[in-house]
């Protein structure tokens, strides 16, 4: 389903970009994705119900999502027609990846053993920007006592580990190789 979601997301992204509605489409799709998470079983039931016609599934989309951007609604109708309305969250995640790549931004999780100050976060964000060539970093912080000291940053699939725990693990590996 991930490939299918990527295709829908790419088509919607291209239309939104061409019509200069990228931010509006992103916001609507994000809202719909988050709200649909609570109703995933019902959406799967709609997808798998053989007695529902394509028109009935389209009417459902129109009634529930009628205030969304027309391009989002049309995408949802196509999803419903093809019995894929339940993958709307995956479509959003794929759309979000395209959106973040376009704006050269990404999410970062900064883990440390204590709550970081705004100044410390700003310095880490600047380091992330230099390492990743991102122009914008959306930060979530997390306290992780297992790190012992220092910090660990996760951006996408990349991990930058400056923790004391990582240093100790690396040191232990060197000792093991030496023996």
Swiss-Prot record:
Topology term for the membrane: Peripheral membrane protein
Pfam families referenced in this protein's UniProt entry, alphabetically: OSCP
Keywords: ATP synthesis, Cell membrane, CF(1), Hydrogen ion transport, Ion transport, Membrane, Transport
Chief subcellular location: membrane
GO molecular-function terms, A-Z: proton-transporting ATP synthase activity, rotational mechanism
Single GO cellular component term: plasma membrane
Subunit and partners: F-type ATPases have 2 components, F(1) - the catalytic core - and F(0) - the membrane proton channel. F(1) has five subunits: alpha(3), beta(3), gamma(1), delta(1), epsilon(1). F(0) has three main subunits: a(1), b(2) and c(10-14). The alpha and beta chains form an alternating ring which encloses part of the gamma chain. F(1) is attached to F(0) by a central stalk formed by the gamma and epsilon chains, while a peripheral stalk is formed by the delta and b chains.
PANTHER family listed in its UniProt record: ATP SYNTHASE DELTA CHAIN
Protein name: ATP synthase subunit delta
Provenance organism: Staphylococcus epidermidis (strain ATCC 35984 / DSM 28319 / BCRC 17069 / CCUG 31568 / BM 3577 / RP62A)
Gene expressing this chain: atpH
């Amino acid at each position: 389903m991930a490939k299918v979601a990527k295709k829908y997301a790419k088509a919607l992204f291209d239309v939104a970009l061409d019509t200069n509605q990228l931010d509006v489409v992103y916001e609507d799709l994000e809202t719909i994705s988050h709200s649909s998470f609570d109703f995933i079983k019902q959406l799967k039931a709609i997808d798998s119900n053989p007695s529902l016609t394509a028109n009935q599934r389209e009417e459902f989309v129109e009634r529930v999502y009628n205030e969304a951007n027309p391009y989002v609604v049309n995408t949802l109708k196509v999803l419903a027609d093809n019995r894929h309305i339940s993958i709307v969250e995956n479509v959003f995640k794929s759309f979000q990846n395209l959106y973040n790549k376009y704006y050269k931004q990404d999410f970062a999780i900064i883990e440390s053993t204590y709550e970081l100050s705004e100044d410390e976060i700003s310095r880490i964000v600047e380091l992330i920007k230099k390492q990743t060539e991102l122009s914008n970093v959306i930060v979530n912080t997390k306290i992780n006592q297992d790190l012992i000291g220092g910090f660990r940053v996760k951006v996408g699939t990349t991990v930058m580990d400056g923790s004391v725990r990582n240093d100790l693990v690396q040191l232990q590996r060197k000792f093991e190789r030496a023996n």
